[in-house]
A protein has these predicted regions:
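Bacterial N-terminal signal peptides that target proteins for export
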Residues: 1-10
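Bacterial N-terminal signal peptides
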Residues: 9-19
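N-terminal leader/targeting segments and the immediately adjacent pre-domain N-terminus
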Residues: 22-155, 212, 216, 449-457
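Short, charged, amphipathic alpha-helices and their helix-cap/turn boundaries
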Residues: 128, 146-150, 192, 226-267, ...
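Active-site SXXK
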Residues: 145, 162-186, 210, 282-286, ...
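Active-site helix/loop module of the DD-peptidase/beta-lactamase fold
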Residues: 180-223, 262-263, 288-325, 330
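Active-site-proximal alpha-helical segments within enzyme catalytic domains
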Residues: 213, 278-285, 324-348, 416-433
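Active-site Gly/Thr loop motif
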Residues: 309-313, 365-429
Length: 457
């Protein structure tokens, strides 16, 4: 696969995704958005390491919106590492001493390649990370709890960075914990836990189907929805940011959610369609079951136990609900600590296991291959590009990909990722700020290939 066909900086690429839009009005909105200051790429990701001058920051603040950030241009480099300047946030605090991660570097990983989805061989890991088109900012790979590879071409290690949809893995993990502990019956309708949505199409959605992204509602976050400023996805993100929608109106989150419509002829559980809108509702479910704010529950169950170096910052909607589908922020090393709790090396970061075997088993087995195949998950560009020769069996419990061997992966917008492989005792995490819809993210393939190679050592 030749990435030169996807040169990010070229405005000539815009028609590639404009042609998929549903209406001329949407085309015009995207074209206008691409002309705004900071929407296109002129800066390398290394600019984040150097910092930005006041003129740049002032411009980023003036242009801030959910859609402007989605474009992944120069301003997005500032948003992904300084997001708490724009949306209110709460903090899940660490507790106790920092869990030190030993460095046992394996230089040979820099030369790692893998067979991509089209059967071709990738460039080396180091070459990909150093390629300015990749927009990778930080990568870490750990084996048996030790850091065996790390690189920070586009951020400082101590900087906080947005998780984007990697955050969904946290929501799914917490709900699976609650299910395993008998605190929730996941066969019940999701509106039993979110009364504000009673009387809407959400009444037809069992909690377990929402957890597995098979709601039967027309709320998919496909490529078109991501770039359509009037989609349900962009509307809910705008409501959470507290910024006007495409029609200039600041919407209430529950009003947006109540607008969801059922897909004709499709019942919940039949087709898995990726959706941040679903996870938005699941965060409210966690709060209803526990009687705690989402942030405090994350702190109690996970963040205070992993020896994190920094707080986990979680943005809040104007109504105070945590934006748990994407607006979490931490250092990359703390994300790696979180990834370790799913592996046999959990003891490196915690004095007790946080993810019970039953919880892990449910996430590894509790979904439908038929719903996965029928839905849009296999069509995601990163799935095709990385795993056409090694396909996941399904998505599950908010994880995007689960393999037969039990490995799990969650991808995030603007190209973030978490790979955790319990059988091989390997985790991989990465941050980036890459425009959506312009080129596939190839880092996930390196993570899985590294796990296979390291397990043989």
């Amino acid at each position: 696969m030749n990435l030169s066909a996807f040169r990010f900086a070229s405005i000539a690429l815009v028609p590639l995704f404009l042609s998929t839009m549903a209406t001329a009005q949407t085309n015009e909105a995207v074209e206008a958005a691409m002309k705004a200051p900071g929407a296109q790429i002129t800066l390398p990701v290394s600019a984040v390491r150097k910092g930005f001058n006041k003129e740049f920051v002032d411009s980023a603040r003036k242009q801030f919106s959910n859609f402007h950030m989605q474009l992944g241009g120069d301003h997005a480099l500032y948003y992904t590492t300084h997001f708490t300047e724009f949306v209110p946030a709460a903090m899940a605090l660490p507790s106790g001493p920092v869990s030190e991660l030993k460095r046992l570097p394996k230089p040979e990983l820099a030369d790692l390649t893998y067979t991509m989805g089209d059967g071709s061989t990738s460039k080396t890991l180091q070459a990909h990370i150093n390629d300015p088109d990749s927009r990778v900012q930080g990568v870490m790979i750990l084996h048996k709890g030790n850091v065996v590879y790390e690189a920070f071409p586009g951020m400082r290690p101590e900087q906080l960075h947005i998780w984007a949809s990697v955050a969904k893995s946290m929501v799914g993990t917490l709900l699976t914990m609650l299910e395993s502990e008998g605190r929730v019956d996941t066969s019940r309708p999701i509106t039993d836990f979110v009364p504000e949505l009673k009387g809407s199409e959400w009444d037809t959605v069992p909690l377990i189907d929402a957890m597995n992204m098979a709601s039967g509602l027309d709320i998919s976050e496909d490529a078109e929805a991501t770039m359509n400023p009037r989609s349900m996805f962009q509307r809910i993100v705008g409501a959470d940011f507290g910024v006007p929608n495409a029609d200039g109106v600041v919407e209430d989150e529950m009003d947006v959610l109540r607008d969801a419509k059922q897909i004709e002829g499709e019942d919940a559980g039949e087709v898995a369609r990726y959706s941040s809108v679903i996870t938005k509702v699941l965060v409210a479910v966690v709060e209803d079951i526990t009687g705690q704010t989402y942030t405090s529950y994350v702190e109690d169950r996970i963040w205070s136990h992993i020896g994190a170096r920094s707080p986990l910052v979680i943005n809040l909607s104007p109504q105070g609900l945590a934006v748990g589908y994407g607006l979490l922020h931490s250092t990359l090393e703390d994300l790696a600590r979180y990834a370790l709790i799913f592996t046999p090396s959990w003891h490196v970061v915690s004095d007790k296991p946080l993810v019970a075997p039953e919880v892990l088993r449910k996430m590894q087995t509790g979904s439908s291959a038929e719903a996965y195949t029928a839905g849009d998950f296999p069509d995601h560009s990163w799935v095709r590009a990385n795993f056409g020769q090694d396909m996941p069996i399904f998505n599950s419990h908010q994880w995007d990909a689960v393999w037969e061997d039990g490995a799990l992966f969650k991808h995030g917008n603007l190209y973030q990722g978490i790979y955790t492989d319990p059988a091989r005792d390997v985790v991989g995490v990465f941050f980036a700020t890459s425009p959506v819809n312009l080129a596939p993210d190839l880092v996930p393939g390196y993570m899985r290939e590294a796990a296979k190679k390291l397990a043989k050592q």
